[in-house]
């Protein structure tokens, strides 16, 4: 019985000592994950590539608190996107609507939908076929900044245009 108890004690120590070590793998952020997609996005110097779109045209529009109306800067960014889409007719976009962490999940999903639809309606009114644009709302579920101050909140209040060559 004593040998069984010693054996159990030794195994317990090994298990516990393995749990007390710090993880050596750092936390991976979305930007790190997204950088792996650069291979598929093409060359940033190719004006017909998704990488060019993201870097030079701009893929996001920011919004004021509790607003879904586009300001002039947002309209200008969307006009640049529309020009790129007119030159690259094989691509479609999915506009993701996002919100900051304040408010309920339901409210922020609805606000994200209004933001995505605002960008979509602007794009369609300027000549992009509605069949080339889909919208989705993530509300506050996918923040790009994780802190509780206005700088972070403002980056999370956005509509992001994700370019795709897949059929809807």
Task: Tell where the protein language model's regions lie, with residue ranges.
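Sec-dependent signal peptide recognition
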Residues: 3-10
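C-terminal motif of bacterial Sec signal peptides marking the signal peptidase cleavage site
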Residues: 15-18
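Periplasmic peptidoglycan-binding/tethering modules of Gram-negative envelope proteins
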Residues: 20-92, 166-168
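Extracytoplasmic/secreted proteins, especially bacterial periplasmic and envelope-associated proteins
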Residues: 73, 77-80, 106, 114, ...
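A non-catalytic structural micro-motif
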Residues: 90-98, 113-144, 157-168
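Short beta-alpha junctions and helix-cap segments that line functional grooves
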Residues: 146-149
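A generic structural micro-feature
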Residues: 151-155
